[in-house]
Design a protein with these regions (language model features):
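Conserved beta-strand-loop surface patch within small alpha/beta domains used
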Residues: 1-115, 128-199
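Histidine-centered catalytic micro-motifs
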Residues: 117-126
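Residues immediately flanking
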Residues: 122, 154, 206
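Conserved small/polar residues in nucleotide/adenosyl-binding loops
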Residues: 201-208
Length: 208
């Protein structure tokens, strides 16, 4: 996997949702396809890695902000939350009322000013393929170009984002990790009694 560390100057992009700033300190992971730019906040990425280190299947919800400018989709994933009411398996991915109640309760408490950007899924031992169940679950509950699926696959814990294109899900190729204080995510982690190494994680780049 290719990792490139650099600083990106603050920019403004003008799209149909107005002006917005791009993160300043970022780390590129893999090669992006140019049509989507996915920015994953570092606390979120660290939380997902730890949460998905379990041997059983697990799912999480992704929150943040979606923007569109100059033909490019921008996903700013600022938060994530474990879905405790779901026990995912390759042939069993159910988003029932209990799941959505849990998700909206978490949003109301921690991430009130953010939107659902998609979901994250780990199925240890299953492999990297997206089966019919995974694709159907995404299209039924996260349809549209403003939602994404984050997969953590295999023993190597390969991380891949997927977005909707041509009637199915396709890999975005790569993504960006960015750094900020992210108090809402820290508050969620503290209340969830996460590992201290996750809470006190210090990145090599400064958080503004």
């Amino acid at each position: 996997m290719i990792e490139i560390v650099y600083k990106e100057n603050k920019e403004q992009a003008n799209g149909n949702e107005g002006y917005f700033h791009l993160p300043k300190n970022i780390r590129q992971v893999g090669d992006t396809n140019g049509r989507e730019r996915i920015y994953l906040e570092d606390y979120v990425g660290t939380f997902l890695k730890k949460y998905f280190s379990a041997p059983e299947g697990r799912a999480a919800m992704l929150f943040g902000e979606f923007k569109w400018a100059d033909g490019i989709s921008y996903f700013f994933i600022r938060s994530a939350a474990a879905i405790h009411t779901m026990e995912p398996a390759p042939d069993h991915l159910v988003f029932d009322d209990a799941v959505w109640t849990e998700v909206h309760d978490v949003m109301e408490k921690y991430f009130k000013n953010q939107q659902i950007l998609g979901w994250a899924l780990s199925l240890p031992g299953y492999g990297e393929d997206l089966n019919e169940q995974i694709i159907r679950a995404h299209l039924n509950h996260f349809g549209g170009n403003d939602k994404t699926l984050f997969r953590v696959n295999g023993q190597e814990k390969e991380e891949t984002f997927y977005t909707y294109e041509g009637g199915t899900l396709r890999s975005t190729g790569g993504f960006y990790i960015y750094y900020e204080k992210n108090e809402p995510m820290q508050s969620y982690l503290i209340d969830q009694n996460q590992n201290r190494s996750c809470l006190l994680y210090t990145s090599p780049s400064p958080r503004d």
